[in-house]
């Protein structure tokens, strides 16, 4: 059984730090420190949500477009998908790898869309970065502050020619890629790679049908 959307959405309901201001020049993006990028992005997305009445009201199409255009470009989906699929990734054909990336991305887009629709008055505390000069992979550790206990939210990031990109996310001690790897392995063992693709496609189709439903007045 794949990760329950409701449970994961509950975990990442404050995972808004992934947002990106796409007007940022490429040169600045490539020079920006990873912890500063997370801090800036968190402020950007909070400002966007507070200013956009459609997002606040739960307009699913608007939220999905927001996530797809502003968040996902800062995620290394090739690495994330390959890691989630595990050893079976190398056995997959190029076409299967392409489909896996597409369906996995769609799944995460809708998951984050559900998370962003729940953002209210949270703030983020970015902890001091523990890294050496020249490091190309780091973990940026943060806390989400709101009602109740602080929520641990950490990012695994890698330095690329286009700046720092996220390839894994830790919420309350649970790494996203590791969680999906376990579930994907079970699906592949039972139904093969094509079976995993079909399962992801079905979940995304069902999610799209739900999103297309009538809006409440």
Residue map of PLM features:
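Short beta-strand edge/turn micro-motifs at domain boundaries
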Residues: 150-178
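Sec/Tat signal peptide C-region and signal peptidase I cleavage site
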Residues: 23-30
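Low-complexity, intrinsically disordered terminal/linker segments enriched in charged
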Residues: 171-217
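Bacterial N-terminal signal peptides
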Residues: 13-23
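Surface-exposed, charged secondary-structure patches
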Residues: 110-151, 203-217
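Solvent-exposed loop/turn segments at secondary-structure junctions
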Residues: 106-107, 131-132, 172-176
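Early exported N-terminus immediately downstream of N-terminal targeting peptides
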Residues: 31-112
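N-terminal export leaders
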Residues: 5-13
């Amino acid at each position: 059984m794949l990760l329950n959307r409701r449970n994961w959405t509950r975990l990442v309901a404050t995972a808004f730090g992934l947002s990106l201001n796409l007007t940022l020049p490429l040169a600045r993006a490539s020079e920006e420190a990873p912890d500063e990028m997370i801090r800036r992005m968190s402020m950007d997305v909070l400002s966007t949500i507070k200013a956009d009445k459609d997002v606040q009201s739960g307009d699913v199409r608007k939220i999905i477009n927001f996530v797809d255009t502003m968040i996902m470009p800062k995620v290394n989906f090739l690495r994330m998908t390959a890691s989630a699929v595990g050893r079976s990734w190398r056995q997959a054909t190029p076409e299967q790898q392409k489909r896996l990336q597409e369906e996995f991305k769609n799944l995460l887009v809708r998951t984050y869309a559900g998370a962003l629709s729940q953002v209210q008055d949270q703030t983020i505390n970015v902890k001091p970065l523990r890294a050496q000069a020249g490091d190309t992979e780091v973990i940026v550790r943060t806390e989400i502050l709101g009602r109740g206990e602080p929520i641990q939210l950490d990012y695994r990031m890698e330095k690329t020619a286009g700046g720092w990109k996220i390839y894994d996310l830790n919420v309350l001690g649970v790494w996203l890629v590791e969680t999906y790897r376990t579930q994907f392995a079970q699906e592949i063992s039972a139904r093969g790679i094509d079976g995993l693709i079909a399962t992801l496609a079905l979940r995304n189709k069902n999610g799209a049908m739900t999103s297309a439903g009538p809006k409440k007045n």
